[in-house]
Amino acid sequence: MSGTTGRTTQRTDLDARSERLLPSVELPAPVEDLAAAAATRLGWDGTVLPPMTLLGRRVVVVAEILADAHAERICLGAEPVADRATVSTWVWPELAGRVPPPAVRIQGVLSVARHWRTGLVSTVPFGRYAETAVVLPWWAATTHDYLVNCLPRARRFGVNLLTADPEGVVELDLPSTLDGQPLEKDATSRWLNEVVYERMLTTVEASA
């Protein structure tokens, strides 16, 4: 009995010391604050929308209203259409000039994550349609795994990597290598535009 108790006590002491050596897994600031700081650091103009789920990923979108197109849609009574099946028909050649114009410009899509794998899984699918970025806590960028696995993948997919220090100050660690490359315009990009347009109007109304 005494031997078992001693081993348990020793293991508990080791676990406690290990926990003190590990950095906190909590983010240094709220997701919304870190996302806004990252958008500013990257020079993304527009509104930083609340976190939303797109393509099954939890991301933060930065977008701006296209004033002329928005005004035209108001005049036509063309509200945002979030139904993906409906929007998929808007790119058909026979509907050219007969569908509402895109009313927002997506400046970027980012993920605020505790681990780089989560961040890249969330943002890489959007790289075809917008600039992308991942914000990580500072300690996540100090690991061997980050250096040998994360950085090469981020370069390959053109994802900006940023880190947040314990005070929540965000710095750019790795800029995108795909800046200026043309973005795809297809049924998915048109649908993303409509969903973001809908969220943009909801956000503006809520803050009014």
Report the location of each language-model feature.
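Acidic-basic catalytic patches of nuclease active cores, encompassing PD-(D/E)XK
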Residues: M1-E94, R199-A208
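Alpha-helical protein-protein interaction elements
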Residues: A36, R84, T118-V121, L183, ...
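A broadly tuned "polar low-complexity/structure-edge" signature
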Residues: P51-L55, V60, P125-L136, A141, ...
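Catalytic cores of nucleic-acid endonucleases
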Residues: P80-F157
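Non-catalytic C-terminal interaction segments of nucleic acid-processing enzymes
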Residues: P93-R98, W139-A141, Y146-A208
